[in-house]
Each structure stands twice: as structure tokens, then as C-alpha cells.
Amino acid sequence: MKKLLIMAAGTGGHIFPGLAIADTMQARGWEVTWLGTEHGMERDLVPKSGIAMDTISFAGLRGKGLRHTVTGVLRLLASFGTCFSILARRKPGVVLGMGGYVTVPGGWMAKLRGVPLVLLNADAALLLSNKALTPIAQRVLFGFPADFGNAADKALVTGNPVRAEISALMPPAQRYAQHSGALKILVVGGSLGAQALNAALPAALALIPAEQRPLVTHQSGKKNIDDLRARYAQAGVTAEVVDFIDDMPRRYADADLVICRAGAITVSELTAAGVASVLVPLLVSTTTHQRDNAHWMEQQQAAIHLPQSELTAQGLADLLQNMTREKCKQMAEAAYANGRRDANAAIADVLEKLVKNT
């Protein structure tokens, strides 16, 4: 039996596409195992999917102070030995890194053991971890057309893996033709929520006359749901507030407009489904990945790029009042034209070509 080890940890942006690929490979008869950490979302999501998971304690190095950095270096060194043992025991025929710190020790130990390494770079810019591993990787797969940097001779644009139910949605022209009444807005803060969106949306909607307001579903993140419900109540705005959405295909199908961050997997889902969006990139001092993703979407006329520094209640209220279903449909069709609904199969085909019999 062919065997795949997936390396992914932390937030949904790394884990959900890994799970999508796991489903694809299992459907092809492969055995899939997972390398993650003890503290990320994968701790719950991966076992629930019936995938065996091994963990390391390494948790990244950047931006958390000298003490954390020193501790991180020591854990990184220890994790190399742990990864070597995991690979020896699992005997994968190919290793797939989904980006992020967990891929570094696992990737180098794959090289040491002679196991082919494939990297998925979800964003429009090359991730630091992938830059470090590119020299030893057989292939670097990109979610979007990009400056391939030092990966040019190994690069292949496959798109990012998304759930089959999202790719299978009706094209936007058909979906939007079925929509009527007030605009339906879906606000998605990601697996951890987005405080800037949680603050801006209730205030913006309060500035719109009640008879002109769109219908809103707002995903808050588990920690923020009580606070967000209180914000909407204080603003006198009716909204459906949920902590987590487990039926995203239906939510995308129902929405005229999505307001969200610009993570690579979110953008890939928006293009695969064909949904209009307002993208508010997360401000991170160490990377510009989300800004690059949002800029790319705006260039395709598939989204509105709204920098967080320009996110105000009045500005957002004006934007929403000037939005029409026809404008949303045009953005959605542009997004759909740039979607890769064959990404799962394209990535799977690469793995099939490189797998080493064990």
C-alpha cells in the first residue's frame, strides 16, 4: 500500500487543506498519517477524521521574545530526532508539507531517510519554511501564480486543495439568479475569529437604516461569541452570530457577499465556489502573505481589498449601502474564473508520480 505522511499544524489554514488531500489519497487507496503538534487545532480535527497522528513539541521561533526563541531552538533540535523516529516507524513513500514550522524538522528528516518531499505553498508569496526546504524538495506546489523565488525549477501551480462539496457548488450565475430580497452577508473571522471584523460590522450595520440592512451571519470564534452578541445587541442590529461554521458549502451558496480575512485557503475556497468578497488582510509584522493574496484578488476584479487601516464603521456602511446583487455576481464570476476546482486531483497526481515504494 502506498503511504503518505502529511505535515501540518496550528490553524485551519494549514490543517483543512491537509485533510482535503488526505480524503483524496485515501479514496485512491493510500494509507495517510499525520505529523502535527500537541497544541494546535490538529489535535482534535485529525483524530476525528480517523487519521493516525504523531506529534512534536516544536512551536516556532519568530516574534515571541528571546526566552521563547532559545526554548524554541532547543525544542527544534530535539524534534529532529523525534521526526527521524516517526519516519522510521511510519515508513511513508512520500511526505507532503503544508507550510509552517512543523514542516522544517520533518522535511529535513525525510531528506535524510531518502523519502521524496513535496511542499505546498498556499499563499501568493513563498513561505519562509518553504524557502528553507526548497533545496531538498522534489516539488513545490503553489496555490496561486506567484514569484517562485528559489523554487522556480521545482514549481507547479496546482491551486490549493478545498473540500469537494465547495468545488461542486453551482456556478455563481446560476446561484445568484436564485437569490432575492435583502443582500445576504457572511462574515468569517477564521478558526480564531477576527477582532477587527467583530468590532466593525455591528457599528457599520447600525449606521444603515433598518429597512436597507443586509441579512448577516457572523462567525466570531469561540472566545469572542458572547462579546460579539453583546455588540450587536447594543447596536440594535439583528444578526445570526455563531462561533464556528461546519457547513461552509451551504453558507457560501447562500451568501451574496463574504467579508473575511485573506488567508490562502479562504481565498481558494472563494474562487472555487465563486463568491464575491471584501477582503481585510490580517496585519502581521513578519509576513505580507494576506495582503498579497487580497491584492491579487482585487487585480482579478474578484474582490474588494479593504486594508484594516482603512476599516471604519462609516466606510464599511457606505460600501455595503452601495453594493448590489449585480455587483456581487460580477465579482463572484471573476472569482470563479480564477478558481482551481481540480487542485486536489492535481496534487494527488504529483504524489502518485513521486511516491517511493516501502
Curated annotation (Swiss-Prot):
Listed name of the protein: UDP-N-acetylglucosamine--N-acetylmuramyl-(pentapeptide) pyrophosphoryl-undecaprenol N-acetylglucosamine transferase
Matches recorded under CDD domains: GT28_MurG
GO biological process entries: carbohydrate metabolic process; cell division; cell wall organization; lipid glycosylation; peptidoglycan biosynthetic process; regulation of cell shape
Membrane topology: Peripheral membrane protein
Domain of life: Bacteria
Pfam families on file: Glyco_tran_28_C, Glyco_transf_28
Family classification: Belongs to the glycosyltransferase 28 family. MurG subfamily.
Molecular function via GO: UDP-N-acetyl-D-glucosamine:N-acetylmuramoyl-L-alanyl-D-glutamyl-meso-2,6-diaminopimelyl-D-alanyl-D-alanine-diphosphoundecaprenol 4-beta-N-acetylglucosaminlytransferase activity; undecaprenyldiphospho-muramoylpentapeptide beta-N-acetylglucosaminyltransferase activity
Enzyme class: transferase
Organism: Herminiimonas arsenicoxydans
Pathway given in the UniProt record: Cell wall biogenesis; peptidoglycan biosynthesis
